[in-house]
Curated annotation (Swiss-Prot):
Main location, first listed in the record: plastid
Residue sites binding Zn(2+) per the record: 216, 286, 294, 297
Organism (species): Bigelowiella natans (Pedinomonas minutissima)
Protein name stated in the entry: DNA-directed RNA polymerase subunit beta''
Superkingdom of origin organism: Eukaryota
Keyword Signal set for record: no
Entry's family note: Belongs to the RNA polymerase beta' chain family. RpoC2 subfamily.
An annotated Gene Ontology molecular function: zinc ion binding
Catalytic reaction(s) noted: RNA(n) + a ribonucleoside 5'-triphosphate = RNA(n+1) + diphosphate
Function description: DNA-dependent RNA polymerase catalyzes the transcription of DNA into RNA using the four ribonucleoside triphosphates as substrates.
UniProt keyword Iron, yes or no: no
GO cellular component: chloroplast; DNA-directed RNA polymerase complex; mitochondrion
Cofactor(s) needed: Zn(2+)
Cellular compartment(s): Plastid, Chloroplast
Amino acid sequence: MEKIFFNYPFNKGKLKTLLIWSILNTGQYNMINLVENLKKVGFQYATTAGISLGIDDLKTISTKYDLIEKTNDNIKDITNHLNLAVLNEVEHSQKLINSWQKISEILKININKKFKTVNKLNPIYMMAFSGARGNISQVRQLIGMRGLMADPNGQIIHLPIKSNFREGLTVTEYLISCYGARKGVVDTALRTATAGYLTRRLVDTAQHVIISQLDCGTKQGIFLSNLYQGTDILLALKDQLYGRVLGKDIKINSLMYLKNQQIDDSLSILLANHLKRVFIRSPLTCKASNSTLCQLCYGWNLSHSKLISLGEIVGVIAAQSIGEPGTQLTMRTFHTGGVFSGNVKSQLYSPFDGIVEYSSSLYGDIVNLYNGNFAFLVKRKGLIIINPIIKKIKPKKFEAILYTLVFVKNNEKVKKNQLIAQQSNKISNTQQIEGKYTVNSKLEGEILFDENHLSTNKKKIWILHGKIYKSVFPLQLFPKKNDFLSYKFPLAQAKLLNLSASFLKVCVVRKKRHFIKDNISQSNEILLFTEYPLYKFLIKNIKNYHQFQFFYPIQNKIKEVEKSLRINNKVIKDNRIKIPFNSIAKSKLLNLLNKRLEQNTFFSKNTFSNYYENTDERTTWFTQNSILKYNAIYFYKSSKSVEAKTSRKIPITFNSKNFLIKEKLFFIKNNSVLLPIFSSDFFTKFTLKNEYFKPKHNIQRKLGFLSPTSYFKYISNNYFLKYLNFYQKHISVEMNDIIKVKLYYKQEFEEKTNFKKQNLHKIDSKINLFMNKLILVIEHLILTKLFSTKINNINYLLFYFNYLKYLKESNKFTIFYCNKKKETIFDLLFLLKTLNTTSNLIILAENKISTKLLSEFIYQTIYLIKNNITINSTNSVLENFNYFQQRKEDLFQHRNIFEKVPNFSGKRFSNLSLNINNENYSISKAENKMLIQDLLTLTILNNNIKYFNSHKSFLDKRFFYNESLPIPKILKDFTSILNRINFWSFSSSQFYKKHFLFALKTDNLINIKNKNFIFISRIPQIQAVNFALKKSLKSSFDLKSYEILQYNLKFPLGFYSLIKMIIEERSLFDIDYFQKFIIQYKNFSFHLINKKLKNIFTNNSYGSFTDESTLLESKYFNKRRPTKTTFSKLMNQIKFKFFIKVPLLLSTFSKKDTVLFNIFITNKKENFRNYKIVNMLTNDFYKNLNLQTHSSEKNSQLKLSSKNLEIFNLFYTSSIINVIMKKSITNFNKNFFIDNLFQFSKTHFNWLPKWDTIVRIQFLSPYQGEIIAQNIVKYSGYKTLYNHLMILTKNEKLQVSIFRNKNQETIIKKDTKNYFITKPHCCKIYPKFGSLIYSTSQVSPGKKINQSGQIIEKSNSFLVLRKGTPLLSPITGIFYVWNGDFVSQGSPIMTLLYNKLKTGDIVQGIPKIEHFFEARKGNVDLIQTNLYIKLLAFFKKYNKTLSEYRAVKRSILKIQKIIIDGVCRVYCSQGILVSRKHFEVIVKQMTSKVKIVNGGETGLLEGEFINFQKLEKINTNLYHRRVVYEPLVLGITKVSLRTESFISSASFQETTKVLSQAALEKRIDFLNGLKENVILGKLIPGGTGLIVKIITNKI
């Protein structure tokens, strides 16, 4: 056999070709023998040659040190330029890196030359340049210099490693280079893990893809062409065609190649040579069923070079082929040289010293490079000639091709190794990215802009050194500019004031009693005041006082009063509750009705009980009959009419506005009444003998004062006053008072429209809308076993003015029977706005309910008016009923409060029946079926309910809520009422407004045992509805309800139903004061809309009225702005450790204390309560306020005289409330009580009168030096201003002599005892006082200084310099400072913008592959690379001209090509060749689903993901409304989780979620894939063997 000699190097590629040829032509056996022989030959010759590597083979380069020295000199110059602000930081960095990079490149060239000239057989040279091991850049590190390194962030460290491995590294260089080594180790570990996970995901994605048939019959396919990276071919067409199948007939040179012909090596070369793109069959377009593939679409099995076998599991093969090379890919590479290194081949260095000359044909432009330098860009070819200075050397010519950059001018001298030119491709915009570099201050000081340079391009910014003193609080500082401070000099003083005359105060937060756990947290509050009053003024003189942001009255007189009170020991007043002065916001736009704004100030601590604890048994402070009066529980009402003139252009109708105001009055009054109840709680020796509280009068009294109030309201503006007087006179009213009430009403509402009730027997479920547009009709189906069989399924229609009756009896009331006693109780249904079908009186007897528990109503409540008449007095009830009916008609039209009027005195029902005294059952509707709770709970309730006994005048109630009703969230224009039952102790209520409802999550049973406790429901979000209900209740409250209100006022969000109502009322007013207030209710925006008003008001969240509150963000008294006061906003302002008093003042409190309660939770937005000031401050402010407080036997009237208030001190807002010792109050749940615990200690010193100073706090100077500047700073997010000082200490100054020699300075001659001082001649001093000088400038003849700065002192012999650092201001950039600002060390000064070249994508290797395969939507990267966005863009583009099916098809093909090309580029750029068909198998799975946009007739849901092929089959069978869909690209993780097999998905990730979802959907797993069969232990549906059926004969 003739031997063949190959005369060229036999590298890896040639070896691979030889082996493939061998296996194809000679078979596997011979190929293995060939490989064995090659191995032997290789080892034999390697042994014979004996190449080894010793340290002697590392020959260093002698020119290296000269180069480094020159570069060091160059770098010194660059650094000086930076210090003189000639360069900015970015230019400095680029010049440094360029300098070192240049050396590195020169050394590389020299190494090459040295090896070639000295010893070509040097082992290192042989290894590196033969490609056997290593490359030139590694050799450079061995014997040249290692060069620049990157830090862990990828930033280049400016200190290069000058040594090489032959010489050894210094300690510093070793540490710098460590990062690279560590990174390599970490990368290797991470790389294998990441590649393994990538493989796992890919396998899960495609494990079910199997070859199932020979030919699927498709006519579709894809075009293949060369894959380019820029202009280079990354993957040639012939390599892609090998092993594929033609998709159509192709004719080349009269030869026809048929469709379905397999492409071997020779055919692939032929096709690639003749065609730019070839149409072939592809897995992407295969039509085989069940996500399988056919043999022809797949092509060859590349390991055998023949068509793939049937049953081959190509999905797993594809996944492993892609994942396995992943370990060879780099995770992330930081291109250290990147931006700054040119291409080695493309740079031209001068070979010797000489003069550069250009040929005349050289043509181009001057360009500004990305590193800031200028160069000449060649646009027409020419020559560069270097003429040597030494004549003996021949000149050298170089060709300058297109786009060469030339750095040297014509005829300029160049030195050896100077860079002359550099080839470059044209830099497109896409290759440039804008870089940002933030310059941070290296020291603290003051910014100064150099005005002298403003005209030039090179502007300078100076940082003049100095120490900054920042005040912790907004304080007034004692020293001024130019004062000298000594160390620890007091700069400011603040004092801590006691807010209220009190003992040591502790806030205890205790969980409600129904909950076992007690969370107790304490906070001590501190108020800081600076001692600088800013202004003193008489309030009379201030008209526009809203200009002032801070308002604080100082009441010295009160202090004295308190002290004297304390001495008397009769009454200790807690002045915390002084009425705040209120401000009215006037508006000129008020034309509606009367211009009156009523301000209500509530001070109530709702769930705040007051405790007194004595550590000492002896109560030294109180005599036995004394009482501690807690005004904290007052509801103070200060109502002041401003501009009482009315400009009525409309007749007064009794509209909701008016009645709201009326309600307010009631509310107020009751509050004052309630007061005493509180106080007696803890002093057992007190008995309340106040006649108003005698139980027998409770009910009547209510009636008594109810009507007159409303009556007076229309008579005079001073109704408040009269109302109080009236109240004092009336004690009891007998039952027949009801008729009087009626008369009052008639007088009031003279314009009546009577609405007749209609019986809508025939209407089954229609919606009737009646006037006021406030009608919501709810159809409700109640299914309950409790009902008698007659009314088992009933639709209830609720109408605004309709009475809907489904019962067969035509009575106007329903009769219920109580099983036990067979007593008949008449329920009078009082229809105000709506009659809710049947009223629901509930009588509970022995755990059974004879009547139905639920009815629903909307906007109205059902009045259960119990006459409290015993069963036999039926007649009287009937009479009353008629009366009521009339009344109902009267009241109806005025949607007003009086609905509640019906109250009767009389005896209660027997214990077993439920005693309802003015009880309102509000029944709520949910949109789902109404749950009627197990009624056992109710029965329990019944047994425990006790209302006012004849003995007690205290509350002892339970409020019951149905527990755990399933309720969806409802948010509708009109109220729909939630599914729950409330027992309120008020007669009834009515809605006149739209409310938004929020769903309740859980309700629970509320128990009110103590007079002082009010119910709190643990309801996360309470309904507006309930509030509304309460609203109307006012008129007939009885004491109980008031009490409740009182307590409730402060509930945190969840529980205020009561409160809200009250508040709401209060905050309504007739005039369009503030155009619109939107108050946010938790996360819902909650608007109450009144018919004729634009106002939107009331923040029920806090049981306070925020409606008129202006936005706190603006100046505090800015009244015209529509507010969106969300609670969160307020809290943000308050959110630092101390609470700045200013916003508090705004919050209707002159009483800091109350506010403190609210604040005590800083972290929780919900718990803060917003107050605002709404009353005008005038001297007669308190005249109308004649508050009656009943305490003990005496009537002590609290009269606040206005005189004290006339003089105010306006303080700078330095008041701060500090929550000190805050413990565990981060999460303040709605089911908390807040109890104020007053501990009386044994020592008398713990008693502090109000406004006493607790402690003085001094703020001391940390530095010694001169104050040279003062700044007032406002931090974003804070309302207050802070004082900052700039202090110049010794270290920041430099004293410089103006003389060159020391002996030139002042000489003192000693002559006996006389001293002679000889002055040297005066030198001329160049710089002026205050001027800025640089470190190189002369200060006097022959004298330079080495420090930049500003001259701040000048004398005959020396200058004093304030040190400074100049910075070059960029032409384009972002500034963060202004002239005169103080900057601390490390704070940003400016951001420099510059362009740099892209160095290839920083994301390399596996992360880049994941980017394609995961197709994440929310990727932070640019929109251009987001696959999902690209896909939608393609779809929209094609959808304009094509059908939906074709648009989806084409856009998917497009995105498939992008993904496959992208992944191929990553692998090819790393030198790894993976067949394209593997990517196609995976990508097909990623794009096989589409997203439903509209299900059409199919019932498919919007947003579902459906297989594209299946959906098209469905669509072809639809004729009318087809399915509308859009294309989808899913990442491999999502594909794995959404496979047809839930067993496969569950074994991948999120097992529980996948299995539970599959169970709920009742999915069936058809076990088509491998994985699910393996898991279940079944045969897999794949494999290339033969399936032989074994038939056994039955024996």
